Amino acid sequence: FQFRPHTVADQAYIGAYQGIGVGYFNFGNPEELGNPLAVYLFQGGRIAQFSPRISLNYEWNFGASFDWRPYDDYDNPENQIIGSKVNAYLNVNFYLKWALSRKFDLMIGATGSHFSNGNTQYPNSGLNTVDCKVGLAYNLNRRADELAQSWQRPIVPPFPRHVSYDLTLFGSWRKKAVAHEGSSG
C-alpha cells in the first residue's frame, strides 16, 4: 500500500509504502535448523531520487518466523544457536530501484536479517545473515505518465504545530541462566 506518486501525500512521506510479507528460508541444514517461514509487516521508502526512474530506497521487516528445529539435548544437540520453534524476525535492506517499464522495477541491494527468541528459551545466540538482494517488482496500477514526470523536491504544505501523546504498553519474559556450585555451566 502506498500513496499515489507525485501527490502531496507521497511527497510528504517520501514514497513510503507498507504491507504484509511472507518469506521462506533455507540455511542448507534443515535437519539441524529447519526451513523457517517468516510472516512480517514491512515498511519502506525512498531515501534519494537520482532520476525519474532510479532511486535509493530502504525497507525494514518485523515479524515472526516458524518451523525452526530448536536445540534439544538428545534429538538436536548440534544446534547451539536457536532454542525455540518460533522466533522474532527482523530485517533491514537498502537497494537501488530502477523503473524498467510502466509495469516492472528492478531492485538491487543488500539486506541484513536477525532471528532471535529474545532469551525466552536457551540457547539463544540468534542467527544473523547478510545477503545480496535482487528483485523484480510488478506494478499493478502505475500510470504511463508517472515515469515521464520529473522528480522535484517535496513541497510539503504547512503543518499546524501541536502536541500529541502516545501511551505504549508492553510485556516480556526471559529465561535467566544461573550457574550452581559443581555445575558445568
Predicted regions span which residues?
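Gram-negative (and chloroplast) outer-membrane scaffold detector with strong preference
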Residues: 6, 13-66, 185
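Outer-envelope beta-barrel architecture signal
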Residues: 12-18, 52-58, 102-106, 128-132, ...
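Extracellular loop and loop/strand-boundary signature of outer-membrane beta-barrel proteins
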Residues: 27-30, 76-82, 117-124, 177-183
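Short glycine/proline- and aromatic-enriched beta-strand/turn motifs that initiate or cap beta-hairpins
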Residues: 1-4, 131-133, 137-141, 147-184
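Membrane-embedded beta-strand positions of outer-membrane beta-barrel proteins
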Residues: 18-20, 58-62, 94, 108-110, ...
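Transmembrane beta-strands of outer-membrane beta-barrel pores
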Residues: 3, 22-28, 62-70, 112-116, ...
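Repeated loop/turn-to-beta-strand initiation elements of outer-membrane beta-barrel proteins
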Residues: 6-9, 98-106, 142-146
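Residues that define the transmembrane beta-barrel architecture of outer-membrane proteins
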Residues: 1, 14, 33-39, 84-90, ...
